[in-house]
């Protein structure tokens, strides 16, 4: 089930407010009463948990117009709630049959302020953001291995994040050449390795040049930083300590470069062919098999 809404109000020629929201509910059920109970279907039903997911985002955007310049203030709140439940033989008649009960919540509250200044052939965007996020995880799981064991895990995490950014965009008089130069810096209060904006400084440059007609040559290069997943940030050891904080976890870094051709036959249609190079560094890895977490699939045990 999905739902969304948007309400926009114009106070006067210089001020407007938009409020919007969207949400989704996924409520999965196992079809244990199917007629074709083949061996394959029995296997799938035996390990697949019941998944329930709820997510929503609510936000408001205030804009003030001053000549060619625009000031924006954006506030939003989003939540992702996940539940995975599994009973042995899908028999819910007794709690003794419960083999998995996973519940997690990710909540983000965001505030962003942005100014857009317009000049002849030139535009400047500057802004900053402040966010507070919470993450909780409650997991009960019975593992039937060589030595059966019960996992009873819980964690809570609160994280304050902040950032600054600026982008300058130039466009020639005949619109033949366009250049964009930007920089962004992010930090948070998770650990000393993450609370300095200069340690996560992200410069980026993109260029576009019209070779002839509607054919353009595009190129870009930049460095980007990404916060590790909340599951990694909030992971605790048996003593209740954030394990990856002690491991000096840092932002994930990605250096990227791209080059390509673009054909724009009209204002609403374009064709492009591009090549990219990406190099990742400081990516979290699994200690069990030394595989980056991005390459590991989901295993319901």
Question: Model-predicted segments: where are they?
Answer:
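Repeated loop/turn-to-beta-strand initiation elements of outer-membrane beta-barrel proteins
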Residues: 14-17, 68-71, 81, 121-124, ...
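Outer membrane beta-barrel strand-and-loop segments of large Gram-negative receptors
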Residues: 104, 108-114, 152-165, 246, ...
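Outer-membrane beta-barrel transmembrane domain signature of Gram-negative proteins
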Residues: 50-54, 64, 99-178
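Transmembrane beta-barrel strands of outer-membrane/channel proteins
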Residues: 19-25, 73-79, 126-132, 181-187, ...
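Residues on the lipid-exposed face of transmembrane beta-strands in outer-membrane beta-barrel proteins
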Residues: 5-9, 60-64, 111-117, 164-170, ...
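Surface-exposed extracellular loop regions of Gram-negative outer-membrane beta-barrel proteins
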Residues: 25, 31-38, 74-98, 136-143, 158-192, 209, ...
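Flexible loop and strand-edge segments within Gram-negative outer membrane beta-barrel domains
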Residues: 16-65, 71, 79-107
């Amino acid at each position: 089930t999905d739902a969304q809404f948007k309400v926009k109000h114009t106070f006067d020629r210089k001020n407007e407010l938009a409020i919007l929201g969207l949400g989704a509910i996924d409520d999965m059920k196992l079809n244990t009463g199917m007629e074709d109970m083949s061996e394959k279907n029995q296997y799938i039903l035996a390990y697949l948990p019941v998944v329930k997911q709820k997510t929503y985002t609510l936000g408001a955007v205030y804009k003030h117009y001053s000549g060619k310049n625009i000031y924006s203030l954006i506030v939003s709140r989003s939540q992702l709630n996940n539940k995975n439940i599994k009973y042995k033989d899908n028999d819910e008649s007794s709690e003794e049959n419960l083999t998995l009960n996973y519940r997690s919540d990710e909540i983000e509250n965001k505030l962003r302020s942005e100014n857009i200044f317009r000049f002849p052939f030139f535009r400047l965007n500057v802004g900053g953001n402040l966010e507070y996020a919470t993450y909780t995880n409650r997991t009960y799981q019975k593992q039937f291995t060589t030595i059966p064991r019960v996992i009873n895990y819980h964690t809570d995490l609160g994280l304050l994040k902040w950032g600054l950014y600026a982008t300058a965009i130039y466009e020639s008089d005949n619109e033949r050449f366009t250049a964009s130069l930007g920089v962004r810096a992010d930090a948070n209060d998770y650990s000393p390795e993450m609370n300095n904006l200069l340690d996560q400084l992200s410069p980026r440059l993109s260029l576009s040049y019209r070779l002839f007609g509607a054919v353009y040559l595009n190129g870009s290069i930049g460095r980007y930083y990404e916060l590790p997943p909340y599951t990694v940030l909030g992971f605790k050891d048996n003593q209740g300590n954030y394990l990856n904080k002690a491991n000096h976890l840092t932002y994930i870094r990605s250096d990227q470069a791209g080059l390509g051709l673009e054909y724009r036959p009209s204002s609403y249609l374009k064709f492009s062919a591009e090549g990219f190079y990406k190099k990742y560094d400081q990516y979290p890895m699994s200690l069990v098999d030394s595989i980056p977490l991005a390459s590991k699939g989901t295993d319901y045990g």
